[in-house]
Amino acid sequence: MAKRKIVKKKVVKKNIAKGIVYISATFNNTMVTVTDEMGNAIAWSSAGGLGFKGSKKSTPYAAQQAVEDALNKAKEHGIKEVGIKVQGPGSGRETAVKSVGAMEGIKVTFLKDITPLAHNGCRPPKRRRV
């Protein structure tokens, strides 16, 4: 029987200069997505996807690594300018924003907080007792 060839899917390099970095910082994880101005995803990364497990996913260091990974992937597509949209109350929030600003070759144009706030909607979960 003939062996089947495994064909790898080629990554198409897009030439995009401006983009938006969405940072979703929850209490358990930090997700980073880099999109173009229309909202089409170019690159993404998360603390859990980088090998951080359990409570280590929610650390600021894990958030920094996730941002650096996503932006390095996005740089291959020609990203030079980004805006930042931050969502959530997680501990990796501030570190993630700082590490975007510290990335070499990437200029930050704006910073916006898009955390959803309830106007007396659903009842929140009860307080934890430890």
From Swiss-Prot:
Part of the 30S ribosomal subunit. Interacts with proteins S7 and S18. Binds to IF-3. One of its GO terms (cellular component) is ribonucleoprotein complex. This is Small ribosomal subunit protein uS11. GO terms for biological process: translation. Pfam families: Ribosomal_S11. It comes from the Bacteria. PROSITE patterns: RIBOSOMAL_S11. The lineage of its organism: Bacteria, Pseudomonadati, Campylobacterota, Epsilonproteobacteria, Campylobacterales.
